[in-house]
């Protein structure tokens, strides 16, 4: 009888590499998303700036996955598996801004989402939050909370790797499946977020509740507002560094930060890793608040992210990976 997992209700798990030809489930999720984007590119070829380059980028990214898979066939050990998963994590930094290249041909739907905020709250929470709570302490808590996003999916992946290796494939499948599900939404429903939309419309217009359709404005510009808060703070500087590295006018609805963090919290709770769950609790709270505070998201984006994370958990958590 197989040994029971120390942390679990995910069952005992199975040896890693149970997918077809030895690919692990998160790699298969990446292949599926890559196929979606290839078909997307082919069907929208004339609306894209450089479709040939986009196809080449996919070949390059997937070739790294295949190369590490080949190494694992020759040297099947945990170190190489850690590299395979690490490469997938690194490639998220490529897939995320790539959604901008796919969706900018459609124009922005910010006016719709901002109108939802206006209708529900009677104001623009992203505009007022940082104005009302403008102390250095609040600013640092918000930015450190926002930066803790990487704690949720990167650190958690390797916590599982070291504490419960047998669960690694299933957990990473859920996390990467969650990311790619969000990226599909981003490609089909472009929303840039307040930091871009507010600047394009004008702060006075936003404050007055005027939320016009700006069409394809962001197809030719990536200019955004300077994020609010204490600019000399460590958290602010960390987030600014990440923003400069890969932020684009895309991926606001739903908030993938909230969706993935919620998904991870549910995974950790289901695995009964209570100490780790308590450790994540405050960063999770500040992360959810920070998405609106720093003007990365409308309030409705974060609310939608919460429900998206729950839906992803119910979807992927109920699936059992089968040995092929």
Question: Which positions does each model-derived feature cover?
Answer:
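Interfacial segments of alpha-helical transmembrane regions
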Residues: 82-87, 154-190, 195-208
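Membrane-interface capping segments at transmembrane-helix boundaries
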Residues: 4-7, 75-76, 318-324
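N-terminal transmembrane-helix/juxtamembrane module of multi-pass inner/ER membrane proteins
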Residues: 2-60, 79-153
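Membrane-interface helix-boundary motifs at transmembrane edges
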Residues: 48-52, 72-84, 160-171, 272-274
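Central hydrophobic cores of alpha-helical transmembrane segments in multi-pass inner-membrane proteins
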Residues: 60-73
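Membrane-embedded catalytic cores of phosphoryl/pyrophosphoryl-handling enzymes
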Residues: 232-324
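Aromatic-anchored segments of alpha-helical transmembrane domains
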Residues: 35-44, 91-96, 179-187, 282-293
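Membrane-interfacial catalytic/cofactor-binding modules of polytopic membrane enzymes
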Residues: 188-270
């Amino acid at each position: 009888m197989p040994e029971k997992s120390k942390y679990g209700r995910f069952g005992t798990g199975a040896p890693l590499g149970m997918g077809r030809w030895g690919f692990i489930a998160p790699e298969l999720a990446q292949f599926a998303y890559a196929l979606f984007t290839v078909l997307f590119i082919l069907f929208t070829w004339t609306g894209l700036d450089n479709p040939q380059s986009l196809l080449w980028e996919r070949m390059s990214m997937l070739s790294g996955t295949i190369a590490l898979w080949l190494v694992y066939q020759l040297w099947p050990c945990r170190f190489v598996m850690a590299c395979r998963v690490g490469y997938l994590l690194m490639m998220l930094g490529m897939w995320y801004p790539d959604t901008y290249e796919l969706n900018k041909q459609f124009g922005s739907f910010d006016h719709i989402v901002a109108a939802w905020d206006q209708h529900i709250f009677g104001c623009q929470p992203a505009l007022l939050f940082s104005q009302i709570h403008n102390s250095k302490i609040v600013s640092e808590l918000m930015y450190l909370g926002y930066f803790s996003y990487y704690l949720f999916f990167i650190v958690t992946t390797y916590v599982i790797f070291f504490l419960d290796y047998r669960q690694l494939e299933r957990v990473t499948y859920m996390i990467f499946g969650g990311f790619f599900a969000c990226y599909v939404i981003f490609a089909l429903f472009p929303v840039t977020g307040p930091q871009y939309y507010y600047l394009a419309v004008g702060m006075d217009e936003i404050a007055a509740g005027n939320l016009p359709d700006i069409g394809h404005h962001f197809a030719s510009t990536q200019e955004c507002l300077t994020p609010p808060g204490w600019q000399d703070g460590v958290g602010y500087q960390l987030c600014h560094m990440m923003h400069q590295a890969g932020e684009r006018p895309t991926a606001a609805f739903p908030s993938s930060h909230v969706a993935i963090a919620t998904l991870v919290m549910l995974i950790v709770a289901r695995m009964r890793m209570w100490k780790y769950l308590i450790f994540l609790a405050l960063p999770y709270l500040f992360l959810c608040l920070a998405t609106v505070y720093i003007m990365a998201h409308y309030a409705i984006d974060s609310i939608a992210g919460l429900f998206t994370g729950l839906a992803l958990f119910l979807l992927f958590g109920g699936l059992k990976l089968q040995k092929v």
